[in-house]
Structures are given as C-alpha cells and as structure tokens.
C-alpha cells in the first residue's frame, strides 16, 4: 500500500473532492495526506475530517486578461514548490494527486520535478490555469465532463465529480443543525466562502415571499443560510426578527444537504454534484465572473434535466422569489428531486481512485 498526497486548496470545490477520494483510498488500505496552503481553508477541513495535513506557501497566478502577476505571489509560489519538494523527498509518496486551484500547484509541480507520478482531477469543461500548467507532465487526468477544452489528447478519463458519499437521516441532520422537523427546509449556500450577492439579496427576498411568520402557500418554511464566515455579522442583524431564518457562517455540508428540501446556490460543479447526490432541487444563481461563464452552462444543464431553475444574477431581485415559490410547491419539488437523483455522481470517487492506483510507482 502507498502514501498518496492530495494537492488541493482554496475553495470547497477543490477541497471536498480531495477529501472524498482520500476516504476511498484509505478504505483500500492506502495512506492519504492533504497538501495545501498553510493557514488556508484546506487546513481547517483536514482537521475536521481527521486527515493529515502538510502546509506550504502558495501564490495566486494571474489568469489571461488579469494583467501581470504580482511578484510577491510568484515568490510565494516558488517558496511553496521548494517546501513541497522537501516534504515529498522525505515522504516518498506513490503519487501526488492535483485537484486544481492555486494551492494545489506547489505540490503538483514539486512532484513533477522529482519524478513522482502525478494524476489530476479537472471538474470543469475547460482546463483551469493550474491544471494547464501541470497537465502536460501528468500521467492522467480524471474529468467530470466527457470533453474538456485544453486537455492534451490521450490524457482524459471520464470519472465524474467525486463527492462525499455520506447521508444522514433527515431527523438527525435537522437536530444537528438546530432546525425543526416539519417545516420545508430551504438551504441558502453561496459556496465555501459565501456569496456577497446572495447575502445582500436573499434575506430581503425571502422575507417578502414568506412574510414575518415564514409561510409558503403549502405550509411553514425554515431557512438555513450559510453566509460564509466573513459575512455573518452583516446578515445576522437583518434577519434577527425572523425566528424561522437561521444564518450561520459555516455549516456541516453533509448535514445541510441531508436536511434540505430545496436550495438556493451558485452553480459550481461541486455544489451541483452534492445536490444531485442528495436529491435536492436547486434554484441556481450562476457566478457571472466564472471562467468562460462555466457556471451558467452548468446551471442550464441542471435546468434542462429538470432538477432546478436558473436565475441570472442581474435578475436576482425580480425573479428569485417566483422561482423559489415555484420550486417549493410539493409536486414540482418531487419531480425535481427525482430528476436530481438521476444526475447523482455515485461512484466517482471510486472510479478516480482506480485511476490513481493505476499510476502509483
């Protein structure tokens, strides 16, 4: 059995797939360690998940159209590669697995300079900047989509989007979250860091459509709004008079998805995969600044499958309320739940672990 290093970090969309694959590899008898930015979100998640963590420096690189990179960021990236090389020389892993994002780059580049096999996972339909820098020397790339723009021929293997394949009984999830068993539970989640646009608009819109007592046409509603840690102090006072509205800076995602009947989210690949695994219908507000507008295209594919509705950010205040009320109706919600389960990424972590094992040294 081998030690396998998961190079990841930055956002939950990069970190949680690494956690899911780590769990699968551990179940097969391997060892797994997360390698990412020292002090980053990935360090906290590793501790919460009971996974070993190795921290290094990491620097953000400028994407096309963003101008020249900050020299300080380049220096941090170079330091990170040196620190990762030192760790990998001592640890002697069987492979380093890169999940994208700037925090994964030091580990992947360090491995490639040391001749350690690297395997990547690309979650979008267009290869990201970090992955473009590493794909040429990677042994293989597991993908969430059948076709990935920018990926060298012969490198891609379709595996799907790894998610934490864990569910809680609804009553247990509600109890963990401090929510009631009975009302329709609406989850608001703008990604691991929160969403400024959703945090600004959603509380007012939900107050307007559900009223001070929190009632939809078919019955009571309760809201769990994961604002992101930095936005909680701004959102909480605005809903303090609404007993049915619970803002939190951060929430246990497995419990939140297990409790949710409906969710308002962005449209990152990881979020959509987790919603599908849990069978949660979505009202999606794609991030307009996403690379190549990939979140919009992600969201449209979910809508076309019958598992959600798309509300573009520029139409948020005019269209979100109607979309939520439509999706909250029992008949619509049941049909969407069935459609969501048909998109479930069950088995993706196992398929990607198979790919990693084929390239261990």
From Swiss-Prot:
Q: What is its main location?
A: membrane
State the Gene Ontology terms under molecular function. Answer: UDP-N-acetyl-D-glucosamine:N-acetylmuramoyl-L-alanyl-D-glutamyl-meso-2,6-diaminopimelyl-D-alanyl-D-alanine-diphosphoundecaprenol 4-beta-N-acetylglucosaminlytransferase activity; undecaprenyldiphospho-muramoylpentapeptide beta-N-acetylglucosaminyltransferase activity
- The domain of life is Bacteria
Q: Give the EC number(s) listed in the UniProt record.
A: 2.4.1.227
Q: Can you supply one Gene Ontology CC term for this chain's record?
A: plasma membrane
Reactions that this protein is recorded to catalyse: di-trans,octa-cis-undecaprenyl diphospho-N-acetyl-alpha-D-muramoyl-L-alanyl-D-glutamyl-meso-2,6-diaminopimeloyl-D-alanyl-D-alanine + UDP-N-acetyl-alpha-D-glucosamine = di-trans,octa-cis-undecaprenyl diphospho-[N-acetyl-alpha-D-glucosaminyl-(1->4)]-N-acetyl-alpha-D-muramoyl-L-alanyl-D-glutamyl-meso-2,6-diaminopimeloyl-D-alanyl-D-alanine + UDP + H(+)
Q: Gene3D superfamilies recorded for this chain?
A: Glycogen Phosphorylase B
Question: Where, subcellularly, is it found?
Answer: Cell membrane
| Pathway(s) per entry | Cell wall biogenesis; peptidoglycan biosynthesis
Cross-referenced InterPro entries: GlcNAc_MurG, Glyco_trans_28_C, GlycoTrans_28_N
Kindly list any coiled-coil regions of this protein.
none
Q: Which keywords are on file for this protein?
A: Cell cycle, Cell division, Cell membrane, Cell shape, Cell wall biogenesis/degradation, Glycosyltransferase, Membrane, Peptidoglycan synthesis, Transferase
Q: Which residues bind UDP-N-acetyl-alpha-D-glucosamine?
A: 11-13, 124, 164, 192, 295
Q: Where is the chain membrane-spanning?
A: none
| Name of one Pfam family that matches | Glyco_tran_28_C
Q: Which family does it belong to?
A: Belongs to the glycosyltransferase 28 family. MurG subfamily.
Protein's name according to its UniProt entry: UDP-N-acetylglucosamine--N-acetylmuramyl-(pentapeptide) pyrophosphoryl-undecaprenol N-acetylglucosamine transferase
Organism of origin: Deinococcus geothermalis (strain DSM 11300 / CIP 105573 / AG-3a)
């Amino acid at each position: 059995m081998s030690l396998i290093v998961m190079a990841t970090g930055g956002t939950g969309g990069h970190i949680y797939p690494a956690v899911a694959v780590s769990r699968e590899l551990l179940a097969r008898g391997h060892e797994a360690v997360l390698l990412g930015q020292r002090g980053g979100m990935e360090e906290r998640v590793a501790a919460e998940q009971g996974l070993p963590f190795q921290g290094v420096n990491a620097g953000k690189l400028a994407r096309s159209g963003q101008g020249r990179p900050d020299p300080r960021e380049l220096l941090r990236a170079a330091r990170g590669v040196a620190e990762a090389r030192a760790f990998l020389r001592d640890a002697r892993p069987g492979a380093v697995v890169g999940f994208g994002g700037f925090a994964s780059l030091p580990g992947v580049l360090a491995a490639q300079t040391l001749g350690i096999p690297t395997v990547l996972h690309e979650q979008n339909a267009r290869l990201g900047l970090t992955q473009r820098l590493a794909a040429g020397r990677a042994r293989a790339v597991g993908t969430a989509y059948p076709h990935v723009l920018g990926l060298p021929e012969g490198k891609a293997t379709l595996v799907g989007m790894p998610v934490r394949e864990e569910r809680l009984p609804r009553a247990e999830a509600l109890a963990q979250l401090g929510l009631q068993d009975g009302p329709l539970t609406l989850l608001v989640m703008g990604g691991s860091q929160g969403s400024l646009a959703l945090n600004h608009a959603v509380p007012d819109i939900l107050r307007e459509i559900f009223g001070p007592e929190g009632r939809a046409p078919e019955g009571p509603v309760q809201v769990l709004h994961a604002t992101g840690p930095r936005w909680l102090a701004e959102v909480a006072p605005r809903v303090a008079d609404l007993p049915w509205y619970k803002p939190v800076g951060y929430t246990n995602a497995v419990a939140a998805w297990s409790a949710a009947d409906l969710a308002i989210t962005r449209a990152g690949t990881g979020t959509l995969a987790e919603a599908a695994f849990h069978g949660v219908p979505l009202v999606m507000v794609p991030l307009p600044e996403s690379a190549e507008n990939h979140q919009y295209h992600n969201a449209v594919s979910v809508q076309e499958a019958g598992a959600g509705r798309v509300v573009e950010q520029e139409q948020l205040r005019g269209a979100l309320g109607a979309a939520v009320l439509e999706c909250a109706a029992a008949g619509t919600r049941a049909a969407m739940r069935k459609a969501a389960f048909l998109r479930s990424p069950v088995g993706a972590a196992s398929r990607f672990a198979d790919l990693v094992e084929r390239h261990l040294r």
